[in-house]
């Protein structure tokens, strides 16, 4: 599978902002399954070292990735996820993303 340029740019922006707290991305949803269409969004989990405030980081991620969305004309849906909870599969979304997603 070819990783969309928008995802590469997201990774660069997030790594630059979070530094060592950034543990990677998980691409999941229709793009990861190879079933995306022209109107599909790009679903990402942003893996971060805990602890963090979910809503504050969600807001920050939206702000960081907004320029990428404008430049690439791609809708990006990105959510922060604590690395330990993702790896432990404590939430259904994390279990689904682990099963079908691509860790970047």
Predicted segment positions?
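Catalytic core of pol beta-like nucleotidyltransferases
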Residues: 1-23, 32-38, 49-104
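Short beta-strand->loop micro-motif that forms the acidic, two-metal-ion catalytic signature
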Residues: 43-47
């Amino acid at each position: 599978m070819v990783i969309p340029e928008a995802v590469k740019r997201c990774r660069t922006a997030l790594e630059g902002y979070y530094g060592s707290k950034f543990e990677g991305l998980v691409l999941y949803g229709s793009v990861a399954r190879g079933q995306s269409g022209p109107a599909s969004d790009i679903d990402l989990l942003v893996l971060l070292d805990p602890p963090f405030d979910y809503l504050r980081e969600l807001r920050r991620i939206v702000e960081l990735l907004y320029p990428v969305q404008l430049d690439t004309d791609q809708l990006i849906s990105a959510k922060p996820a604590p690395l330990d909870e993702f790896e432990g599969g404590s939430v259904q979304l994390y279990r689904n993303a682990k099963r079908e997603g691509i860790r970047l």
